[in-house]
Amino acid sequence: MVMGLGVLLLVFMLGLGLTPPTLAQDNSRYTDFLAQHYDPKPQGRDDRYCESIMRRRGLTSPCKGINTFIHGSKRSIKAICENKNGNPHRENLRISKSSFQVTTCKLHGGSPWPPCHYRATADFRNIVVACENGLPVHLDQSIFRRL
């Protein structure tokens, strides 16, 4: 009986180590995506907006070179990962069927250390994301296209 419990405990412990990532881990990547790229109701979309939001989101130590904020509903952004608002795009990416209001903040000046100065570009664009388990987890800056 003791040997049977030991084997059962061993199998249980091994099973814990071999299980796939939990939904909570998946949601943390989505949460990180939102923290870095989502701002539903921006207060202005100029250089001051960029400097303020980049600082508030912790993207200024060191100064991040470029970051894009998406202004739209979470539902429409998540829908890119489905056929509702997204199509396959290149390897493991999806492109939105509709355009989104975005603000891209680009570092202006030579130093990567604060104080960081940003230039804002406000636009409407289709966006390209990487998805995991039906949630956006990465915004692909390099293949944006203007409409």
UniProtKB/Swiss-Prot annotation:
Biological process per Gene Ontology, one example term: antibacterial humoral response
Functional summary from the UniProt entry: Secreted ribonuclease that can either promote or restrict cell proliferation of target cells, depending on the context. Endocytosed in target cells via its receptor PLXNB2 and translocates to the cytoplasm or nucleus. Under stress conditions, localizes to the cytoplasm and promotes the assembly of stress granules (SGs): specifically cleaves a subset of tRNAs within anticodon loops to produce tRNA-derived stress-induced fragments (tiRNAs), resulting in translation repression and inhibition of cell proliferation. tiRNas also prevent formation of apoptosome, thereby promoting cell survival.
InterPro entries: RNaseA, RNaseA-like_dom_sf, RNaseA_AS, RNaseA_domain
Key words of the record: Angiogenesis, Cytoplasm, Developmental protein, Differentiation, Disulfide bond, DNA-binding, Endonuclease, Hydrolase, Nuclease, Nucleus, Protein synthesis inhibitor, Pyrrolidone carboxylic acid, Secreted, Signal, Stress response
Keyword Glycosyltransferase: no
Gene behind the chain: ANG
Gene Ontology cellular component list: angiogenin-PRI complex; basement membrane; cytoplasm; cytoplasmic stress granule; endocytic vesicle; extracellular space; nucleolus; nucleus
Transmembrane segments: none
Leader sequence segment: 1-24
Quaternary structure and interacting proteins, as annotated: Homodimer. Interacts with RNH1; inhibiting ANG ribonuclease activity. Interacts with PCNA.
Short motif Nucleolar localization signal, span: 55-59
Protein name: Angiogenin
PANTHER family: ANGIOGENIN (PTHR11437:SF60), RIBONUCLEASE (PTHR11437)
Major site of localization recorded for this protein: secreted
S-S pairs: 50-105, 63-116, 81-131
Residues involved in tRNA binding: 45-46, 105, 127
Protein family according to the UniProt entry: Belongs to the pancreatic ribonuclease family.
Active site: 37, 138
Location(s) in or outside the cell: Secreted; Nucleus; Nucleus, Nucleolus; Cytoplasm, Stress granule
Record-linked SMART domains: RNAse_Pc
Family matches, as SUPFAM superfamilies: RNase A-like
Activity modulation notes: Has weak tRNA ribonuclease activity by itself due to partial autoinhibition by its C-terminus, which folds into a short alpha-helix that partially occludes the substrate-binding site. In absence of stress, the ribonuclease activity is inhibited by RNH1 in the cytoplasm. In response to stress, dissociates from RNH1 in the cytoplasm and associates with cytoplasmic ribosomes with vacant A-sites: ribosomes directly activate the tRNA ribonuclease activity of ANG by refolding the C-terminal alpha-helix. In response to stress, the angiogenic activity of ANG is inhibited by RNH1 in the nucleus.
Residues with Pyrrolidone carboxylic acid modification: 25
GO molecular function: actin binding; copper ion binding; DNA binding; endonuclease activity; heparin binding; protein homodimerization activity; RNA nuclease activity; signaling receptor binding
EC number(s) recorded for this UniProt protein: 3.1.27.-
Organism from which the protein derives: Pongo pygmaeus (Bornean orangutan)
